Amino acid sequence: MLTLKIAVYIVVAFFVAIFVFGFLSNDPARNPGRRDLE
């Protein structure tokens, strides 16, 4: 099932992007001046 494999890759890439974004932004909760997630 090529469609299933593509869907899995999209989900994995989505979570990895969220993890990398949170890591690079150094937890927005610690930066009161940045409210990107609110």
UniProtKB/Swiss-Prot annotation:
It comes from the Bacteria. It is found in: Cellular thylakoid membrane. SUPFAM superfamilies: Photosystem II reaction center protein I, PsbI. The chain crosses the membrane at residues 4-24. Pfam families: PsbI. The keyword Membrane applies. GO terms for biological process: photosynthesis. It is a single-pass membrane protein. PANTHER family: PHOTOSYSTEM II REACTION CENTER PROTEIN I. PSII is composed of 1 copy each of membrane proteins PsbA, PsbB, PsbC, PsbD, PsbE, PsbF, PsbH, PsbI, PsbJ, PsbK, PsbL, PsbM, PsbT, PsbX, PsbY, PsbZ, Psb30/Ycf12, peripheral proteins PsbO, CyanoQ (PsbQ), PsbU, PsbV and a large number of cofactors. It forms dimeric complexes. Belongs to the PsbI family. One of the components of the core complex of photosystem II (PSII), required for its stability and/or assembly. PSII is a light-driven water:plastoquinone oxidoreductase that uses light energy to abstract electrons from H(2)O, generating O(2) and a proton gradient subsequently used for ATP formation. It consists of a core antenna complex that captures photons, and an electron transfer chain that converts photonic excitation into a charge separation. This is Photosystem II reaction center protein I.
